[in-house]
Swiss-Prot record:
Keywords: Metal-binding, Ribonucleoprotein, Ribosomal protein, RNA-binding, rRNA-binding, Zinc, Zinc-finger. This is Large ribosomal subunit protein eL43. A zinc finger (C4-type) spans 40-62. One of its GO terms (cellular component) is ribonucleoprotein complex. GO terms for biological process: translation. Zn(2+) binds at residues 40, 43, 59, 62. The gene is rpl37ae. Belongs to the eukaryotic ribosomal protein eL43 family. Putative zinc-binding subfamily.
Amino acid sequence: MPFSHTKIVGPAGRYGARYGMGLRRKVTAIEVKQRGKHRCPSCRSLVRLERIAFGIWRCPKCGFTFAGGAWTPQTIMGKALAPEELKEVEAQKAKWKEAVK
């Protein structure tokens, strides 16, 4: 395995000593979140979604293309209002109510 110059700084290692550490830390945080595993809204599988363009994402498993955030597939506001998430929460609440009775 070749020597890696980005072991500590992560994806921002490609910038070398340029742009300052603060900006490189921000870039690293964004890119780690962007390239991590996310749940597909269609097939619900946990995969690395492909970013096709600014805010457009595709699931490599099922091929579902959807609009999301610029840097992450689902924004905080979108996650709060996603119908799939609300259905899961309602189902969980119903299970808890039945368990209490």
